[in-house]
Swiss-Prot record:
Membrane topology field: Multi-pass membrane protein
Domain of life (superkingdom): Eukaryota
Species per Swiss-Prot/TrEMBL record: Mycosarcoma maydis
Top class in the EC scheme: translocase
GO terms under cellular component: mitochondrial inner membrane; respiratory chain complex I
Gene: ND3
Protein name, as recorded: NADH-ubiquinone oxidoreductase chain 3
Keyword list, A-Z: Electron transport, Membrane, Mitochondrion, Mitochondrion inner membrane, NAD, Respiratory chain, Translocase, Transmembrane, Transmembrane helix, Transport, Ubiquinone
EC number: 7.1.1.2
Subcellular location as annotated: Mitochondrion inner membrane
Main location (coarse class): mitochondrion
């Protein structure tokens, strides 16, 4: 029997056996605290679902996703580093330059600030000269 065939047969069978063993042997003690929804550190919302919350959570999630995908795409390149041609190297350099420019832009617009006046949630226009994404005014201090 082929090794891959063995894995395709053995792993699902083992998973089903372990799931049924868990259902049969696990202690079931339902509690009101255990069955309540947990919503990212907030109290569960009952009734009205239109409560205000900070949009920064979504912004951080999207930024995390973008840079997590960057790491995911970097790993195969790192594994084949010695087999990559000059063309592949320059494609990778351009990839990192685009991500670096994006990070500098996010930092400049204040997307990474939560409690500062420079937060991007204030809907400042990037076209304004005093709100340029790459420069701060003289009255603002950089961290």
């Amino acid at each position: 029997m082929n090794t891959i065939t063995l894995f395709f047969l053995f792993i699902p069978i083992l998973a089903v056996i372990l799931l049924f063993a868990n259902l049969l042997l696990a202690v079931h003690r339902p509690d009101s605290e255990k069955v309540t929804p947990y919503e990212c550190g907030f109290s569960p919302v009952y009734g009205q679902t239109r409560n205000p919350f900070s949009i920064q959570f979504y912004l951080v999630g999207i930024l995390f996703l973008v840079f997590d995908i960057e790491i995911l795409l970097t790993y195969p390149y790192a594994m084949n580093l010695y087999q990559t041609s000059t063309y592949g190297f320059w494609i990778f350099v351009i990839f990192f330059l685009v991500l670096t420019v994006g990070f500098v832009y996010e930092f400049g617009t204040g997307a990474l600030y939560f409690t500062d006046k420079r937060s991007s949630i204030q809907n400042t226009k990037i076209s304004d000269s005093k709100h340029s994404p790459f420069f701060w005014s003289k009255s603002e201090k950089r961290l």
